[in-house]
Amino acid sequence: MPVPERIHIVGASGSGTTSLAAAIAARHGHRHLDTDDFYWLPTDPPYREKRPREPRLALLRDALAASPRWVLSGSLCGWGDPLIPEFELVVFLVVPSDIRLTRLREREIARYGLDAIAPGGSRHQAHVEFLDWCAGYDAGSLEIRSRALHEAWLAALPGPVLRLKGDRAVGEQLKLVELHGVR
C-alpha cells in the first residue's frame, strides 16, 4: 500500500484528532493543519466568528497545496467536500461521550482558566453551551455535526477509512495508523 502523504483525521470534539495528528506530524514529518484554524476567524476570545465558506476553502486548499505531506485534524463535513479527493486516508476516532466531555472540560480549563468557565466567570455561558453541543454528538441528526453526519459522510468517501478507538493512548493509535501504511 502506498504511504499516505495526505491524511485527514475526524471525530467528535474531544476525540483526540488534534493529538493524533500532532503525533503523526512529529514522527513522520507531515505538516499538521487543523480545520478550526480555517473555519474560525481570529478573534479574542477565539471561536466566536465563522469565516465565510469560500475564503475558508481557499485558505485551506492553499495550505494543503503548500506541502506534499500533511495531516489535517478536525471536521469539514458540510463545507469541505471539494477537498475529499485530496485525502489518501481518513482516520475516524470514536470515543465514549463521558471521556470526550471530561477531556473537553480539561481543555477549556487549560485554555481559559477555571475562574473564567466557573459560574459567574466571563466564559461560563459559552462553556456550558459548548459542552451541551458536544454532549449531543452521539444522538444528533444529520443536520448538525454528529455521529450520524460523520457516519454518512464516511460512507460516501471514495478512499480508505481507518476507524480507531480514540480512548486508546495516542502512541497506540499512532502504531495502528503506521500499520495502515504511514512510514
Where are the model-predicted features located?
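NTP-dependent small-molecule kinase module
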Residues: 2-4, 132-183
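P-loop (Walker A) phosphate-binding loop of NTP-binding proteins
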Residues: 12
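Conserved substrate/cofactor phosphate-moiety recognition/catalytic segment
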Residues: 22, 26-68
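Glycine-rich phosphate-binding loop used to anchor ATP phosphates in small-molecule kinases
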Residues: 53-98
